[in-house]
Every structure is written in C-alpha cells, then in structure tokens.
Curated annotation (Swiss-Prot):
Protein family: Belongs to the imidazoleglycerol-phosphate dehydratase family.
CDD domains given in the database record: IGPD
Any one Gene Ontology BP term: L-histidine biosynthetic process
Keyword field: Amino-acid biosynthesis, Cytoplasm, Histidine biosynthesis, Lyase
Known catalytic reactions: D-erythro-1-(imidazol-4-yl)glycerol 3-phosphate = 3-(imidazol-4-yl)-2-oxopropyl phosphate + H2O
Organism: Metallosphaera sedula (strain ATCC 51363 / DSM 5348 / JCM 9185 / NBRC 15509 / TH2)
Pathway assignment: Amino-acid biosynthesis; L-histidine biosynthesis; L-histidine from 5-phospho-alpha-D-ribose 1-diphosphate: step 6/9
Main location: cytoplasm
Name assigned to this protein: Imidazoleglycerol-phosphate dehydratase
Length: 193
C-alpha cells in the first residue's frame, strides 16, 4: 500500500504544494517566505521520518498568518489522505523532548478526530520572522485537517527558540511513530477509526 500523496491548496492569499511519503527516511525540502517556520517544519518532518516537499507562496505579503495556516491545512490533509483507512497504524504515541533547558511533552492519537491543545507559555511576539501565536495555530490547523488529537505542553524552559523547536521535534517524533505500521488491523475497540 502506497502512503504517498500530493496536495495543492490555492487561495487569493497563498499557494501551498505538499508532496508527502509517510514511509520515508526524513528527506525534506521546505520553502516558504518564513525562514524560521521552514526550520521548524524541517525539524518536525525529519523526526517524523517522512519524505516531504513543501512549497508555500504568500500572494498578499501582509504577515506570516496565512502561509502558516495554509501549510498546516494542506499538510494535515496530505497526512489524512496518505493514512487511508488507518489500518495497521500504531495510532497512539508520545514524546518528551529536551533541548538544552527546555522540556516539551507531546501526545498524539491518530483517531480520525481532529483537535489540538497547545500550551508553550510563549511571551515573545516573534521568534525570527514567525509570530509565536502562529505556533499553536499551525498545530491546530495541522491536527484538525489530519484528523488527529494533539497535545503539546511546555514542562520547563526559558529560551523560546528551544521551546518551540522541542515542540516541533516532539510532534514529528510522536506523529511519525503513531502513523507507523505496527500490524494489520484497526486499533480501535469499535473496529474503525
């Protein structure tokens, strides 16, 4: 079963192209107009162990909100499509990621039900060119469109770059493991996801 998909989302504000192979080796190419976001996406997808290309164009140039949101939507839809009926996936996973003084907990359920709760206690307005409010918004857009339940929590840390990077790495690690094939059946007492 191929778990490869290509998705394109084009609006008056953005154009986002995603190529995603869930059973990859972490070969990633990211190009959006928000370099710090590119760095975070690259970390997430590398630790997810997928092969991915994400190309994002911001047609309006107002701020980073639209491109971050639309990448989350498109990548989430690509993950959902690549998972198919979710037969054989591990489904649940979690990760606790240290990055120097920062420590972040991530928990994932690839259930078909989209939800995200993010609490990183970020105080700065921006990290590089990424508005910190868009970190939680990206995770929400990703999770609701992928049909996953996602919880991201800061346990410790003061350096917000480290906190955000640990969060993206943790999401990648936990999501990659939860999407991995572990058997043949559907991991649900209901018999479907």
């Amino acid at each position: 079963m191929s778990r490869y998909v290509e998705k394109v989302r084009e609006t008056k504000e953005t154009k986002v192209q995603v190529k995603l192979e869930l059973d990859g080796e972490g070969k990633v190419e990211i190009r959006t107009p928000v370099p710090f976001f590119d760095h975070m996406l690259h970390s997430m997808l590398f630790y997810m162990k997928v092969n991915a290309t994400i190309l994002g164009e911001d047609k309006q140039g107002y701020d980073d909100h639209h491109i971050v949101e639309d990448v989350g939507i498109t990548l989430g839809q690509a993950i959902k499509d690549a998972l198919g009926d979710r037969r054989g996936i591990k489904r649940f996973s979690s990760a606790v990621i240290p990055m120097d003084e920062a420590l972040v907990l991530v928990a994932v359920d690839v259930s078909g039900r989209g939800y995200a709760s993010t609490n990183l206690d970020l105080k700065r307005e921006k990290i590089g060119d990424l508005s910190t409010e868009n970190v939680a918004h990206f995770f929400w857009s990703l999770a609701t469109n992928a049909g996953i339940t996602l919880h991201v929590r800061k346990l410790d840390g003061v350096n917000e770059h480290h906190i955000v990077e640990a969060a993206f790495k943790g999401v990648g690690l936990a999501l990659g493991e939860a999407c991995s094939i572990q058997g043949e059946g559907i991991r649900s007492t209901k018999g479907s996801l």
